């Protein structure tokens, strides 16, 4: 069995994102991060009050976050994804960082809403609109444009986000373009800077050589390996994302993840009923693993 899994590319072969020259953001981002207004005191109080509930499913190792996509501003599709997450048994929903989309999502579900961006300033209006969690991640659309993020850039984005939003639950994705040792090192630094959750990814360059179940396992191998390695280096929860299915989601929990993130398996479907069924299938697949690992004798599985 042969699997073609892309290895991290050198800086000479891939463009490195310059934060003040980002073609995918709607405005120029200053590399010095000019002073931005902080959220109102009522927003800070709300975030502090909700932290425990947002993190509970991660602590129970049963979190399931359904992702609509960082660049997905299609209200109809986002509404379908949010509805599927709500009705299918997910614990969180992740949408693009847009205040109006947050208002739409919170009108459809009581699940914690996470917003994704690579611009810390964009988080503020989304959080004030009702988002309870922010994510520096969902880099797929950038990779498609040949843009990758360095460890230093991710670390700086994390520092600035934590400065602007000291109370918000903060998840940060470790880029798969880094080698595993560098992913682990970055995760440790992110934990020191106040990240609450580390998310792993597998990228879109894993091409299974087999179909069916074998192919699903091959596709998930990179992010499963990252979740295994990172979860043993940090004390905060790890979320495993990219290329997961009902077959491989339980493997992520056994590997050490506290939850899984699922995007294209759901948001690429054309029918909300099919979306709900897919979310339910993944949620049901997680239940036995979460229950087993919550038992006192389940500790042996994480060695």
Could you tell me what each predicted segment is?
Residues 2-7, 20-41, 46-240, 244-303:
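Alpha/beta enzyme core
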Residues 8-17:
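Short N-terminal leader segment in a subset of presequences, especially plant chloroplast
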């Amino acid at each position: 069995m042969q699997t073609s899994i892309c290895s991290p590319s050198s800086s000479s072969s891939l463009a490195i994102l310059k934060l003040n020259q980002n073609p995918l953001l709607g405005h120029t981002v200053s590399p010095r991060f000019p002073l931005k207004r902080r959220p109102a005191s009522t927003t800070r109080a709300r975030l502090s009050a909700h932290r425990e509930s947002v993190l509970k499913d991660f602590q129970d190792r049963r979190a399931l976050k359904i992702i609509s996509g960082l660049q997905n501003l299609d209200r109809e599709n986002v509404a379908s994804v949010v509805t599927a997450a709500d009705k299918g048994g997910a614990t969180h929903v992740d949408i693009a960082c847009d205040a109006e989309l947050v208002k739409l999502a919170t009108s459809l579900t009581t699940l914690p809403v996470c917003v994704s961006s690579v611009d810390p300033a964009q988080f503020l209006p989304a959080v004030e609109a009702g988002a309870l969690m922010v994510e520096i991640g969902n880099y797929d659309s950038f990779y498609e444009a040949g843009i990758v993020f360095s460890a230093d850039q991710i670390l700086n984005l994390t520092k600035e986000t934590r400065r602007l939003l000291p109370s918000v639950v903060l998840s940060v994705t470790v880029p798969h373009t880094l080698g595993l040792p560098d992913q682990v090192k970055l995760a440790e630094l992110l934990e020191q800077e106040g990240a609450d959750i580390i998310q792993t990814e597998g990228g879109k360059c894993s091409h299974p050589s087999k179909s069916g179940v074998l192919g699903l396992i091959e596709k998930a191998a990179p992010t499963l390996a990252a979740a295994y390695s990172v979860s043993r280096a940090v004390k905060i929860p790890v979320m495993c994302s990219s290329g997961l299915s009902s077959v491989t989601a339980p493997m992520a929990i056994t590997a050490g993840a506290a939850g899984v993130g699922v995007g294209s398996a759901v948001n690429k479907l054309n029918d909300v009923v099919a979306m709900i069924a897919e979310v339910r299938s993944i949620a049901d697949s997680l239940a036995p693993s979460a229950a087993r690992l919550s038992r006192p004798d389940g500790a042996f599985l994480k060695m």
